[in-house]
């Protein structure tokens, strides 16, 4: 746990304590392997913006290198458009609205970036349950990334999701949301969700940023968290965490966009594939 800002020793200690509390519960709930090192950083809003823009560009660069050179002009245009959109809202996100973000590195490690100002404005620090939810959520992304072994095929799928509509973020965020609810239930006797906070309890800074037309427009699309949770919850109930974890190493099990809209279809396909694998019957292609 690093405090790159050098200004928040108490918050650093608080996050370290919560990490110690939630780590075994996240491991137990996900049935996934823990990384050998878990990196959490407290950073400034400016550093968050710079790191997030660099992460976005790295995904596009990976996608670009996998495609024919004749597609480069279109991909370059998409990158410029995405970066322009990001920079329009970045000060509102990194400094106010985004409580935490996790990026996969080139090794088997990931890094979670936390902005102290955003934690305060969003109400995360108002109750220990909300900080525990956030840390459990972001830690789950570390385990997801390790489960894929940061393999090129998975990274390619994530990169391509930037330039076309994909389902991978619904899976990742829905899974992490499901886990953070389970972890807070284990810790506090009931699930806790920062999203349930009344807007009247949020800071004026947060409410103003949240009402900004650019943010309202950005949020007019699909809700990664709610739709993702609606996707993952029935799958967990049907096949269990250990079986669901096969999706991290088998891209054929990834939900389609249609299955995100209709989770029962994904659950049925998972059950068929798992049943086929269990009986040793030949697996169909496609």
Task: Give the role of each language-model region.
Residues 1-75, 144, 263-286:
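N-terminal low-structure segments adjacent to metalloprotease catalytic domains
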Residues 186-286:
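Pan-zinc metallopeptidase signature
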Residues 55-132, 139-146:
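Active-site scaffold of zinc-dependent metalloenzymes
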Residues 17-20, 137, 170-174, 226, ...:
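A structural signal for well-ordered alpha-helical segments within the folded catalytic domains
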Residues 139, 143, 147, 179, ...:
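Generic structural signal for hydrophobic core residues of well-folded globular domains
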Residues 121-125, 157-165, 209-218:
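Acidic/His metal-coordination segments adjacent to aromatic residues that form catalytic metal sites
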Residues 130, 134, 145-196:
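Post-HExxH zinc-binding segment in Zn-dependent metallohydrolases
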Residues 12, 128, 132, 169, ...:
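Solvent-exposed, acidic/flexible segments
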């Amino acid at each position: 746990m690093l405090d790159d800002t050098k200004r928040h020793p108490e918050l650093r200690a608080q996050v370290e304590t919560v990490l110690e509390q939630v780590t075994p519960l996240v491991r137990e709930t996900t049935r996934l392997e823990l990384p050998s090192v878990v990196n959490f950083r407290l950073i400034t809003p400016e550093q968050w913006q710079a790191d997030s823009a660099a992460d976005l560009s790295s995904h596009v660069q990976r996608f670009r290198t996998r495609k024919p050179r004749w597609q480069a002009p279109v991909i370059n245009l998409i990158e410029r458009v995405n970066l322009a959109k990001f920079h329009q809202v970045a000060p509102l996100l990194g400094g106010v609205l985004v409580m935490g973000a996790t990026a996969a590195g080139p090794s088997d490690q990931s890094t979670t970036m936390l902005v102290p100002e955003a934690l305060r404005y969003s109400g995360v620090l108002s109750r220990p349950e909300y900080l525990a939810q956030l840390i459990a959520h972001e830690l789950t992304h570390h385990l997801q990334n390790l489960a894929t072994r940061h393999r090129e095929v998975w990274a390619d799928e994530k990169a391509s999701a930037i330039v076309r509509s994909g389902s991978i973020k619904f899976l990742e965020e829905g899974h992490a949301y499901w886990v953070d609810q389970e972890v807070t239930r284990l810790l506090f006797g009931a699930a806790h969700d920062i999203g349930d906070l009344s807007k009247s309890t949020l800071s004026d800074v947060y409410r103003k940023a949240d009402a900004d037309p650019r943010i309202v427009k950005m949020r007019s699309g699909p809700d990664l968290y709610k739709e993702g949770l609606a996707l993952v919850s029935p799958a967990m109930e049907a096949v269990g965490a250990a079986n669901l974890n096969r999706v991290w190493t088998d891209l054929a099990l990834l939900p389609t966009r249609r299955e995100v809209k209709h989770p029962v279809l994904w659950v049925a396909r998972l059950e068929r594939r798992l049943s086929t694998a269990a009986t040793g019957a030949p697996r169909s292609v496609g």
